[in-house]
């Protein structure tokens, strides 16, 4: 069935990434088109730039934190994507719409709480404000 084919493609993609095995472009495209959200998260999980697969040193905020009032208002669930410094500079200079069209992207993803907790230590300094706000939100929930 179609669901089995999608599940198998996801399994293959994750297996190839986990084991640093080069993959056919067709497998990557199937996975990318079949589940964009998982595709982006896998790149976060493995510190890979969404564009070139090099080490992702940057976390691009699709929703600009400046619009939210600055980094002190940054939330872990804001939409973002993992990028290398070259591609992060590019998206900042040419803009989101042009960048997404150029690389056929569907945008960033909002991380779930579980995803955020699993990757926050891989991107040193990029989630500092998010972490502080996350802790404040949790404290307020418990009051």
Question: What are these model-derived regions, one by one?
Answer:
Residues 1-25:
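Charged, alpha-helical interface segments at or near domain boundaries
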Residues 17-20, 53, 88, 92:
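Hydrophobic/aromatic-lined pockets within catalytic cores
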Residues 27-39, 62-70:
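Short Cys/His-rich Zn2+-coordinating modules
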Residues 33-60, 86:
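Short cysteine-rich loop/turn motifs with clustered Cys
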């Amino acid at each position: 069935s179609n669901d089995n084919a999608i599940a198998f493609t996801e399994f293959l993609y994750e297996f190839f990434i986990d084991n640093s095995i080069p993959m056919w472009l067709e497998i990557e495209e199937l996975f990318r088109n079949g589940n964009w959200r998982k595709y982006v998260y896998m790149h976060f999980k493995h510190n890979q730039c969404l564009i070139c697969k090099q080490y992702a040193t940057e976390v691009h905020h699709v929703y600009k934190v400046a619009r939210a009032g600055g980094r002190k208002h940054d939330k872990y669930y804001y939409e973002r994507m993992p990028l290398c410094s070259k591609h992060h500079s590019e998206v900042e200079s040419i803009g989101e719409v042009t960048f997404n069209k150029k690389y056929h992207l569907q945008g960033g993803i909002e991380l779930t709480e579980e995803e955020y907790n699993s990757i926050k230590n891989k991107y040193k300094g990029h989630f500092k404000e998010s972490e502080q706000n996350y802790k404040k939100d949790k404290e307020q929930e418990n009051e």
